[in-house]
């Protein structure tokens, strides 16, 4: 389950990369898109409380543990991609895969499945928006 928290963190970092590397005529649209994609509501808190505290009766991973795992995950997601929007799309795709794998686990209780469904729904919407933007005939966003 920590993989979901790590993948969300990576998506947030990638959205920040897009946010701060967008210039030119599409600046504001990309800026707003990046802000929207960072919003997973209370998903992280819900997972920590619903899964670790509620189901496992143990403390959730610390922010430090999540951040350390996210650093290497970030490097894997961005490998070979030089455009922030392509990186964000890769991060969202990875998050979707991670969540879908966990959703197939029948041993998880209904509350955890509901949390994963919410993350999955947001991920699907954000993936659609980012993919649509990446296919527009606009100047590419260059990373620095």
Predicted regions and their residues:
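Alpha-helical transition-metal enzyme core signature, strongest for iron centers
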Residues: 4-15, 34-48, 88, 92-96, ...
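N-terminal non-cleavable signal-anchor helices
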Residues: 7, 11, 78, 139-142
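Helix-loop segments that flank and shape redox-cofactor active sites
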Residues: 10-36, 101-110
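Conserved alpha-helical segments that form or flank metal/cofactor-binding pockets of metalloenzymes
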Residues: 26-64
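Long amphipathic alpha-helical segments
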Residues: 49-57, 129-144
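Acidic/histidine-rich alpha-helical segments that form the ligand environment
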Residues: 65-122, 126-127
């Amino acid at each position: 389950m920590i993989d979901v928290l790590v993948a969300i963190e990576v998506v947030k970092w990638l959205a920040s990369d897009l946010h701060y590397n967008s210039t030119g005529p599409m600046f504001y649209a990309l800026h707003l898109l990046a802000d929207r994609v960072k919003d997973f509501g209370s998903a992280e808190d819900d997972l920590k409380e619903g899964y670790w505290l509620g189901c496992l009766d143990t403390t959730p991973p610390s922010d430090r543990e999540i951040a350390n795992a996210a650093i290497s995950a970030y490097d894997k997601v961005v490998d070979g991609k030089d455009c922030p929007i392509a990186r964000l799309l890769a991060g969202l795709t990875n998050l979707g895969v991670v969540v879908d794998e966990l959703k197939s686990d029948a041993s998880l209780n209904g509350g955890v499945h509901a949390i994963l469904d919410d993350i999955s729904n947001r991920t699907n919407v954000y993936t659609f928006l980012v993919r649509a933007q990446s296919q527009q005939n606009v100047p590419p966003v260059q990373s620095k």
